[in-house]
Amino acid sequence: AQKYPEVLRVNQHYERYHFGGRHNHCLTSPVYRRKVREMDTALAQRYAHHPAVILWHLSNEFSGDCYCPLCQEKFRQWLKKRYGTLENLNQAWWTSFWSHRYTDWSQVEAPGEMAETSTNGMFIDWRRFSTHQCKTFMMAERDAVQAVDASLKCTANLMERFWDYDYFSLAEGMDVVS
């Protein structure tokens, strides 16, 4: 985190987390994804074929959101792919109700304490986007491990009563849910 501060998560107040906390990483960060892939590959090369290894546990208890500029831009790209036009997005989110129509994609930011909080469609899409980011991150981890040993089954633990991500979607990328 000291060498690559961009891997640290940003909270809803647009403040970057400090080193040392749990779950303080940005799942969107290309640097973080690359470093995790390198670590997963090295660990898999060392341990995947050990007879005591019967299942590979990916990252522990996926959780949380990041509001960094990169995540904001990826959210906008995800929305553009989903809706195509701002007009479609405005209609789907019913933004005219509170006179919050968007006229430029750069105006769209993740819902939170410093931004929009009353647009339910935006909140749901943010949850969907966050799930997508987590799932692609998790699947990249799985793929790195299974590139070393394709027969190795992968798992991650999903927490009870946790609503940040769609667990049914995450489960599609695992061999076993734990």
Feature-to-residue mapping (PLM):
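Polysaccharide-binding and catalytic clefts of secreted carbohydrate-active enzymes
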Residues: K3-Y4, R9-V176
